[in-house]
Amino acid sequence: MIELADNVRLSFNVTFVTHDGGTWAFRDNKRYADVIRYGKIYVGEHTFIGTGVIIMPGVTIGKRCVIGAGAVVTRDIPDNSVAVGVP
């Protein structure tokens, strides 16, 4: 569920979240029976992921990107981008 292209560099304490355990909080509620949050994570070539980054389910990070320390990546990041904070 996690694919890293060639020449991806990871700093320490990087977290790849391929599923959201938060859905367990309401799993018995029939109204939310179809809510499942999981997805593949892809990181493109020549990308650097900084210290303490959290990458959420279903995210694609493009080629030649820099993801700054402590970022929480909740959506796709296009090629040649710098992303910090909660992009």
Where would I find each of the regions flagged by the language model?
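Flexible, glycine/small-residue-enriched loop-and-beta-strand segment within the central core
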Residues: 1-60, 86-87
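Outer-envelope exported proteins of Gram-negative bacteria
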Residues: 5-7, 11, 64-70, 80
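Short-chain dehydrogenase/reductase
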Residues: 48, 66, 82-84
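Beta-rich strand-turn-strand
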Residues: 51-66, 71-75
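C-terminal end-helix/capping segment
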Residues: 77, 81-87
